[in-house]
Design a protein with these regions (language model features):
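Conserved SAM-binding strand-loop segment of SAM-dependent methyltransferases
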Residues: 44-47
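C-terminal accessory subdomains/tails of enzymes that are appended
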Residues: 194, 211, 260-262, 287-288
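Amphipathic terminal alpha-helices
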Residues: 257, 265-288
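Oxidoreductase cofactor-interface core, primarily capturing Rossmann-like NAD(P)-dependent enzymes
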Residues: 1-39, 51-63, 72-81, 85-94, ...
Length: 288
């Protein structure tokens, strides 16, 4: 039995989909019964709260491997530490942790490093998957202004990023979960090319059928816009700090880890843009 945490999130949902497609026996965790009720057929859904050890213990019963993904919040290391404590008590189970590319130089990956070090110290078998930024973030966070303003915003200047399609992250995760030989290893998961936002805007323009622009803003102005969406202060600061990392060129690394794990090249941004073209349609035309 494989436990997939965060099954309603962007990556967790895709891991569930691909795990079911290859016939893996999985249990998936959800935050509420309402969300669990919408889970696909073929899996066992359970409610789990990282702050409630009894729910973690119930989720771990009979499990051999775990895909661990916690929400991107300030207390991520503490939440995952609670989980790891219960895993140790339940026996020697292999944790496949969704981490992040980068080190201590930025808030978000730094929290993942804390969690990784705790897992290493636990003595449990582990594998760390460290992806770069997600292509799908353009759909989740930027599609609204792309549709309504023909533009998306950031503060990363000309910093290039080897962004990766979530579908490739999930494919790598399923392979690690389904096989042995990955214990004690870390994989840096990136796309096959490093792109600046102007290049991304050009590629989206082609599938959208109109000109889409990238607008670079001062960090303070961008943060103000992020906060206006209801995002927490910490999350806004973490996003701005991550863009600083991008601006400094520290996220441009391209690796072959996706291809080595999955035996296929990473999904190209052009393919991603075609697959998600519906998300970038002109809002005025859709309304008419």
């Amino acid at each position: 039995m494989i436990l997939i945490t965060g099954a309603s999130g962007n990556v967790g949902r895709e891991v569930v989909k691909q795990a079911l497609a290859v016939g893996l026996k999985i249990r998936a965790t959800f935050q509420s019964p309402a969300v669990a009720a919408k889970a696909p057929a073929g899996l066992e859904g359970v409610i789990m709260d990282y702050a409630k050890p009894e729910t973690i213990r119930a989720a771990l019963h009979g499990v051999e491997k775990i895909f661990l993904v916690a929400p991107p919040v300030r207390d991520l290391p503490a939440l995952e530490a609670n989980f790891v404590k219960e895993v140790r008590a339940a026996g020697r189970k292999h944790i496949v942790k969704l981490s992040a590319l980068g080190g201590r130089e930025s808030m978000f990956p730094s929290g993942h490093r804390d969690s990784e070090e705790n897992i290493e110290a636990s003595g449990l078998p582990y594998t760390f998957l460290r992806p770069n930024g997600f292509m799908q973030n353009l759909v989740n966070y930027n599609a609204g202004t792309i549709r309504s303003q023909n533009a998306f915003y950031g503060c990363q200047g000309n910093g290039a990023v080897s962004i990766i399609d979530i579908r490739d992250i999930a494919a790598a995760a399923v392979i690690v979960l389904a096989a042995t030989g990955h214990e004690g290893k870390s994989y840096a998961l990136t796309g096959g090319e490093s792109l600046i936002n102007e290049q991304i805007a050009e590629k989206i323009s082609r599938v959208a059928g109109r000109k889409i622009s990238y607008v670079d803003l001062p960090a303070a102005e961008l943060k103000k816009g992020i906060l206006s969406t209801g995002t927490s202060e910490w999350s806004a600061d973490a996003l701005i700090d991550l863009q600083r990392l991008y601006c400094e060129g520290k996220a441009s690394l391209v690796t072959d880890d996706v291809e080595r794990l999955t035996r296929h090249k990473p999904i190209a941004f052009d393919q991603f843009a075609r697959d998600y073209a519906f998300a970038f349609q002109d809002e005025a035309k859709v309304a008419s």
